[in-house]
Amino acid sequence: MYREKVGIIGGFGAYATLNFYKRLLEEFASESERNYPHIIMDNNFTMPSRTRALLYGEAYDEVVDGISDSIQLMMQNDVSKIILVCGTAHYFLNDVYKKIPEAKEKIVDIINIMGEELKLKDEGEVLVIAAEGALQKKLYQTRLKKYGIKCVNPDEEDFIDIRYFIEKSIVCRKKY
């Protein structure tokens, strides 16, 4: 029986959260449901846009507060790990850690995991597919540099199409 309690913070693109949850269940697939982790999910759809906060400074503190509130909820429920599904949300983590330093021990940093995996696979250069805010602020370039990974951004005129793909990928996939 799997006993770990995992917190998932979603709501930053509902379909990305749905896709992550589906993949998590597939990863733990077994003959018994008792082998799945105890999962607590918080989808705060009312949180302001992370992309607009990064690009225009709109509601930046509200985004930090919203992420912090979700993390606090997870910690109150005694989760052992917290996963933020949204890559762009990782940009705000330093500000979140100033408010909740103990969260750093529980957050599964998906960008660091990506860096470690890419380094193991000896990948020296990757194309970053992410929301405009993460691309403009060079979130992945900055974070993956320590792993020796060079990040290439798509052309700026493709950013809107990429955002649509990120937000609607599950819906689009069902059409084909």
Language-model-detected regions and their locations in the chain:
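Non-catalytic structural scaffold of enzyme domains
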Residues: 1-176
